Amino acid sequence: MKTISLKFRLPLFVAVVCCLSVPVRATAAVMGGTGAGICSEFVTGGGEKNESRPSGREGAVRPDRMRCEYLENPEAVDVPSPRLSWIVRTDSTVYGQCQSGWQVQVASSEELLRRGRADRWDSGRVGGDSMRVRYGGKPLRSRDACWWRVRVWDAGGRPSAWSAPAHWHMGLLGEADWQAQWIGAPGQDDGPLSPDGTEPPLPAPLLRKSFEVAPGRKVVSARVYVTGLGYFELYLNGEKVGRDVLAPNQTNYDKRPGLADCGIPVEDNFREYTVPYLAYDVTERLRSGENVIGAMLGNGFYNVRGRWTMAYGSPRLIAQLEIVYDDGSQERVVSDPTWKVAEGPVRMDQIYAGEEYDARCEQPGWCAPGFDDSAWQNAVPRRAPYGRLRAQNGPADRVMEVLKPVKVEKLGGGRYRVDFGETVSGWVRLHGVRGEAGRRIEIKYLSESPNGSNAYTMKGEGPEDYATRFTWYVFREVELSGWPGELHPGQLTAEAVYSDVETTGGFACSNPLLNRIDRIWWRTQLDNMHGAVASDCPHRERSAYTGDGQTVCATVMHRFDAAAFYSKWIGDILAAQNPDTGYVPNGAPWQPGCGGGVAWGAAICIMPWEFYLHYGDRDMLARNLDGMKGYVDYLDGWADADGVIYARAPHGREPVYWMNLGDWCPPGKLPSDTLVHTFYYWRCADIAARTARVLGDSAGAQRYGALAERVRRAFHGRFYDPGTGSYGPFGGDVFALYMGVPPERYPRVCAALRDNIRRNGGHLDTGIYGTQFLLEVLCDNGMNDLAYGIMTKRTFPSFGHWVEQGATTMWEQWDGGNSHCHPMFGACLTWLYRRVAGMESDPERPGYRHIVFRPRPVGDLTWARYAQLTSRGEASVRWERTAGGFMLEADIPAGSTATVWVPLGDGQTRADVRLSHPAGVSFVRVDETAEVRPGNGGISGDKFHRYAVYEVKGSGRYRFTSGAGITD
């Protein structure tokens, strides 16, 4: 967590350049490729496992960022043979390096691991450059502790030092491992709140259990497995356990038979239902004598009242504390009806309505030893949710930033307005407030969308602190009323809360507006990451829209380490699919208010594919191929004989508008819904075919490839207007060019797109899906000047217009209507990273095994840079142009190769390019893409840069200079 005194922060730029055994022998399964890669020539035995001893001199590469199932030291994993991953680091001045081999050791304790006694698994030396491998040792059981380390060999066959130890723990793998019961408060029914809001709010229950650790007994380990629905906070001996907030992550927890009767009817027949649980190591918290475990429960999404959702039931808890003593004996403390329950100070909590807290209702010491709970009631058993208990596999929500006020305005009468400088998702925290008992402080989170209320009633006993627990708000400013005395700036901070994802990519350039646009999208995206799903907006709907998610996921992966986040959310989407029909709902986890269309369900194809391209993870494709096929087959049932989709309807009903949206939120008119449906039908079939091909499913590749081609022909036959040479404005031509138009139509379609933008004064006219493709389509078809013009406009409709209006986050509508915290339009920002800066993973060698560096200098830009910590290591690009020439600097991680495109000035040749490090670099060709010639209304004057193209065979920092200066 970081504290920020915010006035104005420049866009984040991640400077990538600017980190005696008893082995258990087993075969290692290697993820994501052949394993040999570019270092195969250095591997003894062609990638077979070989014994190796350190040479006494450390190699040039070293492992770092060790993860288990993409998580850092997870406390509960229920994958029987989890995947272990790392990156390798090397000095950028050391060239041609790679990982030529690896060795993983896994032990049952850190002590054994440090002594080299890998009693669970020792892979031995395995040749290859794979940095993601599956555990291959002794079968793992529930509760097993696994400490692991890795070392790697460099291109010269020299081993690194061992990495620092990392660990994971196995969770409770079987139903029989759970001895605890689901329990709840006796004053609440088992069922959910009614949606009409007639019942009074019920206070959040407190639950506690006292137990003894006999004097003289030494606790070796104590771990608690716990979850509470909708949210819970866990306490032990008077202190909160863990940093997690708003736990657990959101899923489809349970059955809701009423779903079929909602406005957007969906059969309650999902592929899978799950309830995430968490595990915490509490060994150091136990004491001799009395101990107390406690929990506070919130409604969360499990018992929510509101138009966007349908509740499951009243709050409930399951907890199992397992204690192991030094004599080998064990003891369990489990949730059951012997636990005590009382009402707590949180008098009302609802995701949408807000939270009210009355400090007069606090019971000091309620979760600590020595408390008298004789007046408390016994807990009551609760029905177990239909969902399977499963270890939480996504990042938890946490307080990630603390912002200080930048302005405090006194309004009079105990009222203040406080500005924190930018829009965040989270809550404010009151510090050291003094006032009389019963004083009610109301906190109004100022927002353009419904945001919920928040109130704190004081107990009047000295300085008091408070922050919300069971919901979040979206705000830049708050208005306080009922404040006692003067408000001092130190008495109020804003806590930004979101899923714990790390920013690992950064962009910057010479145009401050582009930097600002990228920055406000970054903030918007974080504001919308809660419960390891991404919402459309974090206040009004808070829904995990699959359409918004699929369109922006590539941008997210370019800016964040989002592997664990998307592993979880893509799993939710697959789990929400109807296994009988293949239908994928418009949101996952499903909330009945989510409208959408074909493009929304397309997330089941698009998101796993983008994940594969970015992280190189074939397992993601393997898990989702059947789901992809199921969705494409479902769409096929709604297509006409040619392959065009008009509208879908629930089973046995008329078509529903909110199931048939095409594009969404343009500044003016929408393109044809049918055109958008058919485009995404093609895209899903195409991805299914590509996925099948990657996985060696030749029959699937042929079947879905043929279907994609049939739909493509149908699209071109149905939507092209030969009179105008266009597929229509509002994104029609953009979709067609992305798909690929017939060569004879190409000049006219490009001309139509250019003319349409010019008629709009250089502005866009696209919705969320058309905008996603617009800039890269323009760039790739000789119109990057138009893309740059669109992105640097400051008048409506444009991103710059939002900035001129003072936006610190992206808006839902171009005209400022509705939500002011919607990340969906940020999908187009891949243009900044992949085109303007010019760094992209080669789709034929995904996961940054091969990187394409191809900058597109445009407009008045004089420099740009982009950096990313990829799944293989640190990569970055930086370019500058002056009157004297052009400089391109590329950093290639160990084990990766690259193709580098160096812009050339007029009349320049290969001889005009200078290299800082020629070794390992080979010239390929001069690429001079032909001008798009005028004709039949075509365009002229748009010419790609001429490039000298080079292949780079290994890691290092490479600098290329040419004379393609600023005047070119």
Task: Report each predicted region and the residues it spans.
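Extracellular/oxidizing-compartment recognition motifs
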Residues: 37-45, 56-539, 547, 564-567, ...
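Bacterial N-terminal signal peptides that target proteins for export
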Residues: 2-12
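Signal peptide processing junction and immediate N-terminal pro/mature segment
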Residues: 24-51
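Active-site acid/base region of carbohydrate-active enzymes
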Residues: 231, 336-342, 487-520, 524-529, ...
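Non-catalytic C-terminal accessory modules of carbohydrate-active enzymes
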Residues: 314-322, 334-365, 391-394, 400, ...
